[in-house]
């Protein structure tokens, strides 16, 4: 029985990519800088980063290969039981869909559309069309913003006026924040559908529904009912090939949204690291032959990376690491586990955006030969390796190392 489990540690980069200069990210290193800050005692309430399970899978060695130095605080003299390496991104952006699609064998070689102006970010003709088609009385925002700060700035006005908060970032996104109770969740989703259709000429990767609750400034909180409305991947992914072959592809968290539901046979919701881990272990136990279980652990990115919260990121990594033995205990002989990321989001870096970084490539399980797989020239090597293992059609991009 062959099964593959992909654990996507969203934003967990391990060193500035070779083309980081094109993105203003030379020197970024999500893993390296978190480890350095913890080991140096720079973070109140933190000691050295302790990731024994990830480290024995080769994380520290992968980090050294990618950046030239071993992550501070991790033990180097250990037996590595998995295959480890790092991968450069072919895709033109450092965004979520590009990273995920390339990992599944389909790099994004075109340029996404972006709303680059920090104020009055959206074209007036687009805003007018949204107001007319959705029957809005107006809108708030129309700017680049942090998802939490924009709630403090505009949440109360949104509640009193009923006008949705529209904002964007350096990514190819159009985000809409509305209060779940005063505006309504389904109404927010309907608005996102309308905006998704109107954005077609602009080549924007995602519309993101950002529902929140709370009574006023300082206590607004985003909920787990986020929904991403992505464009379709431009070619079949390894997930599509698995589904077409009669296998199962289980999405946990926001995976289905990122692939616009293509290649997915089952969707499982989960919010927060604890619930995502719980759901993952449940689906691993239930998985049959020729199954891919794919979980996105979004909190690394959304809760800690973008918010530049080094302590929170470090604590989350240690929690993630602490759950790995539960997975080890239930693996079967034909199982392959993949741990990777889709981009970086260095919490020590300036700004609030993603960072262009190498990603870790960690494979383990009885079918996997332990040792270095070195530098991979595309994230698609991951998808190609999964396709080869399951006897699926060869992908256009990527080289298998299994």
Swiss-Prot record:
Its main location: cytoplasm. Keywords: Cytoplasm, Isomerase, Manganese, Metal-binding. Its EC number is 5.4.2.7. Its cofactor is Mn(2+). One of its GO terms (cellular component) is cytosol. CDD domains: PPM. SUPFAM superfamilies: Alkaline phosphatase-like (SSF53649), DeoB insert domain-like (SSF143856). The keyword Zinc-finger does not apply. One of its GO terms (molecular function) is phosphopentomutase activity. Mn(2+) 2 binds at residues 301, 306, 354. Mn(2+) 1 binds at residues 10, 342-343. NCBIfam families: deoB, PRK05362.1. PANTHER family: PHOSPHOPENTOMUTASE. Belongs to the phosphopentomutase family. Isomerase that catalyzes the conversion of deoxy-ribose 1-phosphate (dRib-1-P) and ribose 1-phosphate (Rib-1-P) to deoxy-ribose 5-phosphate (dRib-5-P) and ribose 5-phosphate (Rib-5-P), respectively. This is Phosphopentomutase.
